């Protein structure tokens, strides 16, 4: 996608589509009295020609500026643009940069639906946001919207946006806007890389091929990358990781990516660890057939780390980052591990495997330990780990666990930047009692209840005192229904927040 900044007056701006954002300034509904004020639409761009072009439409009440609402006007009077798109950003009182990001995505999705390949977004004036944050939100939202998962349709039509222009208001700092746009595009395209990887079926993205994708990205972005297989797992005594892969004919991949900027010799080293199960049948604890095809998404945590490392390479925070991905297939066979087996992890802790479908924690246990061995002083992992987090939080919030308040404060700050929805869940010591094994140091499942917390508590055993954040994205990594600003399918969840977590340490 080609990106451009212009300061041409809107009336003179020649473009296939000009998108202008608006909010509703009417007070919120009074629930006690059952009253609802009529919408009062306010354009976020002040321009006399624009006001004249939309006066009749706004007076009609056909456009209410509801969040992500769009209304297309052909040949707007008095303007050079071929089409004018009004895009709602919701209530003015609740307007945020994240509402603007989604509105930008809604504008691009509306353009794609009409096979429009070139669009201009008018940067809102003021709204309490600096121009860098505004341009970044527009770029990020536009890039994420410019994606569809129908890669393998023989009749697939390329609807991707070829050109995106931001129209600057008068007296706008063009350099600041350009920096924001560049950041937003970097984040959005990296999130789309994550989504592309998650979308790949298991026969087209084995652990070996995932390693090749990581190496390709790292070569393009100037990152170090090493991909190891079975021999390295045995050398490192990663018995927990190996136990998952032994049932498959596909070899595992231990992927290590490194970002080392100049001037980062001292200070924290951040470790990003991803679960990369490219297909999860459940192993001998076989999953039900219903929806098993979605288990190609069980490497969404690994994909988030690959996307995050790309964005980190582009945004260049001054802090060292190491990423470890543990990738395998979890398959049943005569070689597969059996319920009741005892495995020895990299740190020597013995694990009684009661359920082979609780495999994500087995690969992450060794991945977290290895990231520490490589020098990570702070850890974050992402995994489609438990169905329990889906029961607890549905598809709205992802789960987050943390063993350190300072690391948590960094992640809270990251969420303020990314706008993603995570909900902190408990790590009380009582959950550890549910993992006691009569024959080993720990068992890999804790019973029917509290499954997201017992899974997190299992992982906590392998991080020790290292500050650590655990993201359980099982309920949010895949969307069955499209949003106005984003297609259905892989969401790319966690990647933006991981990047912002890293950047929070560098500020």
UniProtKB/Swiss-Prot annotation:
Q: Which UniProt keywords apply?
A: Aminopeptidase, Cytoplasm, Hydrolase, Manganese, Metal-binding, Protease
| Gene Ontology CC | cytoplasm
Localization (cell): Cytoplasm
- What Enzyme Commission number(s) does the record list for this chain? 3.4.11.1, 3.4.11.10
Residues recorded as binding Mn(2+) 1, renumbered to this chain, are 280, 357, 359
> Which reaction(s) does the protein catalyse, per the Swiss-Prot or TrEMBL entry?
Release of an N-terminal amino acid, Xaa-|-Yaa-, in which Xaa is preferably Leu, but may be other amino acids including Pro although not Arg or Lys, and Yaa may be Pro. Amino acid amides and methyl esters are also readily hydrolyzed, but rates on arylamides are exceedingly low; Release of an N-terminal amino acid, preferentially leucine, but not glutamic or aspartic acids
Q: What is its main location?
A: cytoplasm
A matching Pfam family: Peptidase_M17
Biological-process GO terms, alphabetical? proteolysis
Q: What Gene3D superfamilies does the entry give?
A: Leucine Aminopeptidase, subunit E, domain 1 (3.40.220.10), Zn peptidases (3.40.630.10)
Keyword Nucleotide-binding included in the entry's annotation: no
Similarity remark: Belongs to the peptidase M17 family.
Q: What does this protein do?
A: Presumably involved in the processing and regular turnover of intracellular proteins. Catalyzes the removal of unsubstituted N-terminal amino acids from various peptides.
Q: Supply the name of the protein.
A: Probable cytosol aminopeptidase
Species this chain originates from: Acidobacterium capsulatum (strain ATCC 51196 / DSM 11244 / BCRC 80197 / JCM 7670 / NBRC 15755 / NCIMB 13165 / 161)
């Amino acid at each position: 996608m080609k990106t451009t900044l212009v300061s041409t007056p809107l009336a003179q701006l020649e473009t296939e589509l000009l998108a202008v954002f608006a909010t509703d300034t009417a007070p919120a509904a009074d629930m006690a009295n059952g009253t609802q004020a009529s919408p009062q639409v306010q354009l976020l761009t002040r321009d006399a020609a624009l006001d004249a072009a939309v006066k009749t439409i706004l007076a009609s009440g056909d456009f209410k500026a509801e969040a992500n609402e769009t209304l297309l006007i052909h040949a707007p009077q008095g303007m050079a643009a071929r089409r004018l798109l009004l895009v709602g950003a919701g209530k003015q009182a609740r307007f945020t940069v994240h509402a603007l990001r989604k509105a930008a995505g809604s504008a691009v999705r509306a353009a794609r639906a009409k096979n429009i390949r070139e669009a201009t977004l008018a940067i809102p004036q003021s709204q309490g946001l600096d121009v860098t944050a505004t341009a970044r939100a527009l770029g990020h939202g536009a890039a994420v919207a410019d994606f569809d998962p129908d890669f393998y349709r023989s009749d697939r039509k390329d609807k991707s946006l070829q050109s995106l222009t931001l129209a600057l208001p008068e007296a706008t700092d063009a350099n600041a806007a350009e920096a924001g746009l560049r950041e937003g595009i970097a984040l959005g395209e990296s999130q789309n890389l994550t989504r592309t990887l998650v979308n790949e079926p298991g026969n087209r993205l084995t652990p070996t091929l995932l390693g090749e994708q990581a190496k390709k990205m790292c070569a393009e972005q100037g990152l170090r990358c090493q991909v190891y297989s079975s021999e390295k797992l045995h050398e490192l005594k990663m018995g927990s990781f190996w136990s998952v892969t032994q049932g498959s004919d596909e070899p595992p991949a231990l992927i290590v990516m490194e970002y080392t900027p100049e001037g980062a010799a001292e200070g924290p080293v951040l470790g990003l660890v991803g679960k990369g199960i490219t297909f999860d049948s459940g192993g001998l604890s076989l999953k039900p057939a219903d929806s098993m095809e979605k288990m190609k998404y069980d490497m969404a945590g690994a994909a988030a780390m690959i996307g995050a490392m790309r964005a980190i390479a582009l945004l260049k925070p001054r802090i060292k980052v190491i990423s470890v991905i543990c990738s395998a297939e979890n398959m049943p066979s005569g070689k597969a591990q059996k319920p009741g087996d005892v495995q020895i992890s990299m740190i020597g802790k013995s694990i009684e495997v009661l359920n082979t479908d609780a495999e994500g924690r087995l690969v992450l246990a060794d991945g977290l330990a290895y990231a520490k061995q490589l020098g990570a002083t702070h850890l974050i992992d992402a995994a489609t780990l438990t169905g329990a987090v889906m029961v607890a939080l549905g598809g709205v919030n992802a789960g987050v666990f943390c063993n350190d308040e300072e690391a948590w404060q960094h992640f809270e700050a990251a969420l303020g930047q990314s706008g993603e929805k995570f909900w902190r869940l408990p790590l009380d010591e009582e959950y550890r009692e549910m993992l006691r094994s009569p024959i080993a140091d720990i068992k890999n499942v804790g019973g029917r209840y509290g499954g997201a917390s017992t899974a997190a508590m299992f992982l906590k055993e392998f991080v020790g005192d290292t500050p650590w954040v655990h993201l359980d994205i099982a309920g949010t990594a895949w969307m069955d229904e499209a949003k106005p600003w984003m297609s259905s399918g892989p969401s790319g969840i966690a990647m933006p927040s991981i990047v912002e977590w890293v950047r929070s340490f560098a500020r």
